[in-house]
Amino acid sequence: MAKAANTAAQRARKKVRKNVADGIAHVHASFNNTIITITDRQGNALSWATSGGQGFKGSRKSTPFAAQVAAESAGRVAQDQGIKNLEVRIKGPGPGRESAVRALNNLGIKIQLIEDVTPVPHNGCRPPKRRRI
Protein backbone atom coordinates (compact mmCIF):
# COMPACT_ATOMS: atom_id res chain seq x y z
CA MET A 1 0.00 0.00 0.00
CA ALA A 2 2.84 2.37 0.82
CA LYS A 3 4.40 1.66 -2.57
CA ALA A 4 1.26 2.85 -4.39
CA ALA A 5 1.30 6.13 -2.48
CA ASN A 6 4.98 6.56 -3.27
CA THR A 7 4.49 6.17 -7.03
CA ALA A 8 1.62 8.68 -6.98
CA ALA A 9 3.90 11.18 -5.27
CA GLN A 10 6.56 10.62 -7.92
CA ARG A 11 4.10 11.30 -10.74
CA ALA A 12 2.83 14.46 -9.09
CA ARG A 13 6.36 15.80 -8.60
CA LYS A 14 6.84 19.21 -10.18
CA LYS A 15 9.11 19.47 -13.18
CA VAL A 16 12.50 20.81 -12.20
CA ARG A 17 13.26 24.06 -14.02
CA LYS A 18 16.69 23.79 -15.57
CA ASN A 19 18.50 26.98 -16.44
CA VAL A 20 20.12 26.11 -19.76
CA ALA A 21 20.93 28.85 -22.29
CA ASP A 22 22.12 26.75 -25.25
CA GLY A 23 20.53 23.63 -26.65
CA ILE A 24 19.99 21.41 -29.66
CA ALA A 25 16.67 20.97 -31.47
CA HIS A 26 16.38 17.56 -33.11
CA VAL A 27 13.71 17.62 -35.84
CA HIS A 28 12.76 14.18 -37.14
CA ALA A 29 10.54 14.75 -40.18
CA SER A 30 9.17 11.53 -41.62
CA PHE A 31 6.48 11.25 -44.28
CA ASN A 32 3.90 10.39 -41.60
CA ASN A 33 4.78 12.53 -38.57
CA THR A 34 7.19 15.16 -37.26
CA ILE A 35 8.94 14.78 -33.89
CA ILE A 36 10.76 17.72 -32.30
CA THR A 37 13.02 17.11 -29.28
CA ILE A 38 14.94 19.93 -27.63
CA THR A 39 17.95 18.85 -25.59
CA ASP A 40 20.84 20.48 -23.77
CA ARG A 41 24.38 20.15 -25.14
CA GLN A 42 24.86 16.79 -23.40
CA GLY A 43 21.73 15.31 -25.01
CA ASN A 44 19.41 15.40 -21.98
CA ALA A 45 15.87 16.09 -23.19
CA LEU A 46 14.32 19.37 -22.03
CA SER A 47 11.10 19.22 -24.07
CA TRP A 48 9.57 17.34 -26.96
CA ALA A 49 6.44 17.43 -29.08
CA THR A 50 4.96 15.57 -32.03
CA SER A 51 2.45 16.47 -34.69
CA GLY A 52 0.23 13.62 -33.55
CA GLY A 53 0.46 14.73 -29.94
CA GLN A 54 -0.86 18.17 -30.88
CA GLY A 55 -4.18 16.70 -31.96
CA PHE A 56 -3.48 16.03 -35.64
CA LYS A 57 -4.40 12.52 -36.71
CA GLY A 58 -4.15 10.61 -39.96
CA SER A 59 -2.77 12.40 -43.00
CA ARG A 60 -2.95 15.81 -41.28
CA LYS A 61 -0.01 14.78 -39.06
CA SER A 62 2.28 14.94 -42.07
CA THR A 63 1.50 18.57 -42.97
CA PRO A 64 3.88 21.50 -42.51
CA PHE A 65 1.31 23.25 -40.30
CA ALA A 66 1.24 20.31 -37.88
CA ALA A 67 5.05 20.44 -37.67
CA GLN A 68 4.86 24.17 -37.00
CA VAL A 69 2.40 23.70 -34.12
CA ALA A 70 4.55 20.93 -32.63
CA ALA A 71 7.71 23.06 -32.87
CA GLU A 72 5.96 26.00 -31.19
CA SER A 73 4.83 23.73 -28.35
CA ALA A 74 8.29 22.26 -27.77
CA GLY A 75 9.91 25.68 -28.12
CA ARG A 76 7.68 27.30 -25.50
CA VAL A 77 8.49 24.62 -22.93
CA ALA A 78 12.20 24.96 -23.76
CA GLN A 79 12.01 28.73 -23.30
CA ASP A 80 10.55 28.14 -19.85
CA GLN A 81 13.65 26.03 -19.15
CA GLY A 82 15.84 29.01 -20.13
CA ILE A 83 16.76 28.15 -23.73
CA LYS A 84 17.86 31.19 -25.76
CA ASN A 85 20.12 29.72 -28.47
CA LEU A 86 19.57 26.56 -30.49
CA GLU A 87 21.37 24.42 -32.99
CA VAL A 88 18.88 22.64 -35.24
CA ARG A 89 19.60 19.13 -36.51
CA ILE A 90 17.12 17.97 -39.14
CA LYS A 91 16.69 14.31 -39.98
CA GLY A 92 14.39 12.88 -42.63
CA PRO A 93 12.70 13.91 -45.88
CA GLY A 94 9.29 14.89 -44.51
CA PRO A 95 7.23 17.99 -45.29
CA GLY A 96 7.68 19.49 -41.81
CA ARG A 97 11.40 20.24 -42.10
CA GLU A 98 11.39 23.95 -42.89
CA SER A 99 8.21 24.93 -41.08
CA ALA A 100 9.51 23.52 -37.80
CA VAL A 101 12.69 25.60 -38.05
CA ARG A 102 10.71 28.73 -38.93
CA ALA A 103 8.38 28.20 -35.97
CA LEU A 104 11.35 27.96 -33.58
CA ASN A 105 12.82 31.11 -35.10
CA ASN A 106 9.52 33.01 -34.74
CA LEU A 107 9.42 32.24 -31.02
CA GLY A 108 12.44 34.47 -30.54
CA ILE A 109 14.94 31.66 -30.05
CA LYS A 110 18.21 32.46 -31.82
CA ILE A 111 19.14 29.70 -34.26
CA GLN A 112 22.92 29.43 -34.51
CA LEU A 113 23.25 26.47 -36.85
CA ILE A 114 21.05 24.34 -39.10
CA GLU A 115 22.50 20.93 -39.87
CA ASP A 116 21.05 18.11 -41.97
CA VAL A 117 21.83 14.77 -40.34
CA THR A 118 19.63 12.59 -42.57
CA PRO A 119 21.20 9.13 -42.72
CA VAL A 120 22.24 8.23 -46.26
CA PRO A 121 23.08 4.57 -46.87
CA HIS A 122 26.23 3.57 -48.74
CA ASN A 123 24.07 1.13 -50.70
CA GLY A 124 22.88 -0.73 -47.61
CA CYS A 125 19.44 -2.29 -47.30
CA ARG A 126 17.20 -2.77 -50.29
CA PRO A 127 14.60 0.05 -50.40
CA PRO A 128 10.85 -0.64 -50.47
CA LYS A 129 9.28 -1.29 -53.86
CA ARG A 130 7.90 1.68 -55.82
CA ARG A 131 4.28 2.65 -55.19
CA ARG A 132 1.88 2.19 -58.09
CA ILE A 133 -0.97 4.66 -57.86
From Swiss-Prot:
Which of UniProt's keywords are assigned here?
Answer: Ribonucleoprotein, Ribosomal protein, RNA-binding, rRNA-binding
Q: Does this UniProt record's set of keywords contain Ribosomal protein?
A: yes
Q: What is the top-level taxon of the source organism?
A: Bacteria
Pfam families (alphabetical): Ribosomal_S11
Report a single Gene Ontology molecular function.
rRNA binding
**Keyword Metal-binding appears in the UniProt entry:** no
Q: What InterPro entries has UniProt attached to this entry?
A: Ribosomal_uS11 (IPR001971), Ribosomal_uS11_bac-type (IPR019981), Ribosomal_uS11_CS (IPR018102), Ribosomal_uS11_sf (IPR036967)
Disulfide pairs here are: none
What is one cellular component GO term in this UniProt entry?
A: ribonucleoprotein complex
Q: Which GO terms describe its biological process?
A: translation
What is this protein's function? Located on the platform of the 30S subunit, it bridges several disparate RNA helices of the 16S rRNA. Forms part of the Shine-Dalgarno cleft in the 70S ribosome.
- What family does the entry list? Belongs to the universal ribosomal protein uS11 family.
- What is annotated about its quaternary structure and interactions? Part of the 30S ribosomal subunit. Interacts with proteins S7 and S18. Binds to IF-3.
- Per its record, how is this protein called by name? Small ribosomal subunit protein uS11
